[in-house]
Amino acid sequence: MAFLKKSLFLVLFLGLVSLSICEEEKREEENEEVQEDDDQSEEKRGFLDVIKHVGKAALGVVTHLINQGEQ
């Protein structure tokens, strides 16, 4: 009977250890996904900033050309 108890405790302990390891790996993967999403968001923001600056510059040039044409 004592042998069965020890075996059962060993199996339960090993099961808990493997479950803990799986949970840790899952958390690490989720953190990596969040970090990748953050990186992609930063790239999008950078791209949108470039587009905004190009648009402002183009608007300035067009405005300047229109003002020259009116004079």
Curated annotation (Swiss-Prot):
Keywords: Amidation, Amphibian defense peptide, Antibiotic, Antimicrobial, Cleavage on pair of basic residues, Fungicide, Hemagglutinin, Secreted, Signal. InterPro entries: Frog_antimicrobial_propeptide (IPR004275), FSAP (IPR016322). It is found in: Secreted. The keyword Transcription does not apply. Transmembrane segments: none annotated. Expressed by the skin glands. It comes from Cruziohyla calcarifer (Splendid leaf frog). GO terms for cellular component: extracellular region. Pfam families: FSAP_sig_propep. The modification Glutamine amide is found at residue 68. Belongs to the frog skin active peptide (FSAP) family. Cruzioseptin subfamily. Has antimicrobial activity against Gram-negative bacterium E.coli (MIC=26.35 uM), against Gram-positive bacterium S.aureus (MIC=6.59 uM) and against fungus C.albicans (MIC=13.18 uM). At higher concentrations also has a bactericidal and fungicidal effect. Has hemagglutinating activity against horse erythrocytes. Residues 23-43, 70-71 form a propeptide. This is Cruzioseptin-2. GO terms for biological process: defense response to bacterium; defense response to fungus; killing of cells of another organism. Residues 1-22 form the signal peptide.
